[in-house]
């Protein structure tokens, strides 16, 4: 489930590439009476802004609530092994984000996806690894052959370590919730069984 936060990813490559993601909560643009989450991203190359993006997002699905199609910068909880519509802000285009297979990053099992963006002014291959239960981004690479920058950009070790730490925290919370759900079901089942035993005894008496 998405929540208000701010993070910056650093990429190693021919130039200093960063992407800052900001999730805020406030009145919805379409219905000011309701609260909504807004996801905003800023991509910088050597400090200069080369792309900006902002949209209201469904906290459960990670999809935009209106205005455009395609996932932005996170995948849903429990991502599926299939293609997703993916929005690239540099090309202002929605393209397929195809499932490649399973992988590992920092000891965490991932699902790997790739997207090809090809327009006259921009061509790139983007590959991402997300933690298979939470959908949190753990690794990413851009191979750009045409556009405002060129070359291979990979997520820095610092950003990968921070992402892995956050994903591990999410996984622990998820496991705790699963244990609590199991215990709750078990207690409920025992309570029903005890009530049944009491009922049988009363009828015998």
What are the functions of these language-model segments?
Residues 107, 203-205:
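Generic ordered-secondary-structure signal
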Residues 176-198:
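Membrane-embedded transmembrane helical bundles of large multi-pass transporters/channels
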Residues 73, 77-80, 84-184:
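Acidic, serine/threonine-rich low-complexity disordered tracts
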Residues 1-81, 150, 155-162, 168-174, ...:
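Extracellular or lumenal secretory-pathway regions
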